[in-house]
Amino acid sequence: MASQPPPPPKPWETRRIPGAGPGPGPGPTFQSADLGPTLMTRPGQPALTRVPPPILPRPSQQTGSSSVNTFRPAYSSFSSGYGAYGNSFYGGYSPYSYGYNGLGYNRLRVDDLPPSRFVQQAEESSRGAFQSIESIVHAFASVSMMMDATFSAVYNSFRAVLDVANHFSRLKIHFTKVFSAFALVRTIRYLYRRLQRMLGLRRGSENEDLWAESEGTVACLGAEDRAATSAKSWPIFLFFAVILGGPYLIWKLLSTHSDEVTDSINWASGEDDHVVARAEYDFAAVSEEEISFRAGDMLNLALKEQQPKVRGWLLASLDGQTTGLIPANYVKILGKRKGRKTVESSKVSKQQQSFTNPTLTKGATVADSLDEQEAAFESVFVETNKVPVAPDSIGKDGEKQDL
């Protein structure tokens, strides 16, 4: 009896396991292409690489504004100092003295969508040029406002002096009116003089009295004219003194500030005390405030008092001239190093201390010289004993010398 073929599989028996192939037996498992190859599917031994730690938010992201404003104060802070003074006298300058933030430069981004790469590159490339133009414009505006304020102050002072002089002139008029009531005294005085001349008690004539009185009046008028002439020229001198003295004082203040800034960055070149650190990972700067470095580079860090208040970032220098921010978790602090100025000052202080103690130094020198003389004497004595000498040696003077 022939063998019968096996019955066809039932529908429930043809159900395949997910991931099974079309043929019999378990097929290959499928894997999404988005996942990519794993370590188990890579050929060969997997390479272990050091993954740099994540960078903390940059200063621009922490402050919510442009990174330029972190270490570079806005010029609006300088010109806003005239705002309180200019609101009463120069209201037209107050909108100009608050900067250009309303025009869109350095504005806060309200939308969550990041700008395109072209816009970012354009802003980064044009930032320095616009800042230079802005500083020049603010400088001219500040100078013009200063001159306008100086003119107003001098003019107000001049008006105050004129008001005082006007009050004094009015006071003089009032006193003249009061003294005019004493005309009777003058009449009595005139009659008394006439009586003295008639009786022969006074030998002066009336003409001489009139000439003397006129000379006194002319002298008083000349003094008043000279005082008025000299009083007319002092506002001009005061105005030019303020105009020339103001910029000079500003220049002195700015030069002092630049010297302080130069002294404050001497740590970068190693002149002052600084902290030494070694880079552990590579870092590429993305803004002008940051500096790039590679693993193994030695960096000079500013002291704690000179560090900016930015979380996770340190102020450092790589070449001794350019300073910038670096991530704190990318470097390893090695320690504090004294600057060259400190070392030189310590050497000078030691030399001064040695000069202030001459007796100790002199005693040490004398002791050293005595030791050297004794050592030299011993060496000479030993060499003399080694040299064979005749028992009777004749010196230069013809006498015998015993050694």
From Swiss-Prot:
Transmembrane segments: 135-155, 175-192, 234-254
Location of Phosphoserine modifications: S354
Family: Belongs to the peroxin-13 family.
Record protein name field: Peroxisomal membrane protein PEX13
Family matches, as SMART domains: SH3 (SM00326)
Cytoplasmic side: 156-174, 255-403
Region (Targeting to peroxisomes): 145-233
Topological domain spans for side Peroxisomal matrix: 1-134, 193-233
PROSITE patterns per record: SH3 (PS50002)
Annotated GO MF terms: protein transmembrane transporter activity
GO biological process: cellular response to reactive oxygen species; cerebral cortex cell migration; fatty acid alpha-oxidation; locomotory behavior; microtubule-based peroxisome localization; neuron migration; protein import into peroxisome matrix, docking; protein import into peroxisome matrix, translocation
Gene transcribed to yield this protein: PEX13
Source organism: Homo sapiens
Pfam families assigned: Peroxin-13_N (PF04088), SH3_9 (PF14604)
SUPFAM superfamilies: SH3-domain (SSF50044)
Disease involvement: Peroxisome biogenesis disorder complementation group 13: A peroxisomal disorder arising from a failure of protein import into the peroxisomal membrane or matrix. The peroxisome biogenesis disorders (PBD group) are genetically heterogeneous with at least 14 distinct genetic groups as concluded from complementation studies. Include disorders are: Zellweger syndrome (ZWS), neonatal adrenoleukodystrophy (NALD), infantile Refsum disease (IRD), and classical rhizomelic chondrodysplasia punctata (RCDP). Peroxisome biogenesis disorder 11A: A fatal peroxisome biogenesis disorder belonging to the Zellweger disease spectrum and clinically characterized by severe neurologic dysfunction with profound psychomotor retardation, severe hypotonia and neonatal seizures, craniofacial abnormalities, liver dysfunction, and biochemically by the absence of peroxisomes. Additional features include cardiovascular and skeletal defects, renal cysts, ocular abnormalities, and hearing impairment.
Effect the entry attributes to changing I326T: In PBD11B; neonatal adrenoleukodystrophy
Assigned keywords, A-Z: Disease variant, Membrane, Peroxisome, Peroxisome biogenesis disorder, Phosphoprotein, Protein transport, SH3 domain, Translocation, Transmembrane, Transmembrane helix, Transport, Zellweger syndrome
Compartments it resides in: Peroxisome membrane
